[in-house]
Regions:
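Short helix-loop-beta junction
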Residues: 57-72
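Short secondary-structure boundary segments
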Residues: 98-99, 125-126
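Peripheral docking tails and interdomain loops at the edges
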Residues: 126-155
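Conserved hydrophobic helix-helix packing surfaces used for dimerization/oligomerization
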Residues: 40-43
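Short acidic active-site motifs
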Residues: 78-82
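Short, hydrophobic beta-strand segments that form beta-sheet elements in well-ordered domains
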Residues: 118-125
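Long amphipathic alpha-helical segments
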Residues: 1-30, 34
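Proline-aspartate-enriched helix->loop->beta-strand connector
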Residues: 86, 90-91
């Protein structure tokens, strides 16, 4: 599907149907955490107009398997909402996913409030210009994201 999409031959209905099937499967298999190992949940969001949340669902499921609690803000999360949750919950890590460059604006990272303890800011997806996001860590895959988050919570 991804290769066809890159060639401009992708059928949007196939992509959307497969995405919904995968998200449903990830939600069904997500473990209900009764005693998470982190006292402050990790924040997962897609900034700007980003609608592609499948990576967030996969990360949330992988973290649940590790007994790590998350706040899942999902698609199209405005910077004002991200900032409010960061101030209110002081997450140990913030993971932001951007598929499109128009959503991977490096200014989002610097616009997050400065709090103590400072959360580890993690960026995933092809939409980020890594060289412009010096204050964040770019993660290359699901295992890398889980490893960085596990370190951030001190586990």
């Amino acid at each position: 599907i991804g290769i066809n999409w890159e060639k401009g031959k992708g059928d949007i209905e196939v992509e959307h149907m497969l995405t919904e099937v995968l998200k449903r499967s990830l939600r069904i298999n997500k473990v209900l955490l009764t005693k998470p190992i982190n006292s402050r949940p990790v924040l997962l969001a897609c900034p700007g107009e980003e609608l592609h949340t499948l990576a967030l669902h996969a990360l949330a499921a992988a973290l649940a398997e590790r007994n790590i609690e998350v706040y899942f803000l999902g698609a199209r999360t405005p910077i004002s909402a991200l900032s409010a949750v960061v101030k209110r919950s002081a997450p140990p890590a913030v993971f932001l996913w951007a598929t499109m460059a128009s959503n991977g604006d490096h200014k989002i990272v610097s616009a997050l409030p400065k709090i103590r303890p400072t959360p580890r800011i993690l960026l995933g997806g092809p939409g980020w210009k890594i060289e412009k996001c010096k204050a964040a860590t770019f993660v290359t895959d699901l295992d890398h994201a889980c490893s960085e988050i596990t370190q951030a919570i001190g586990a």
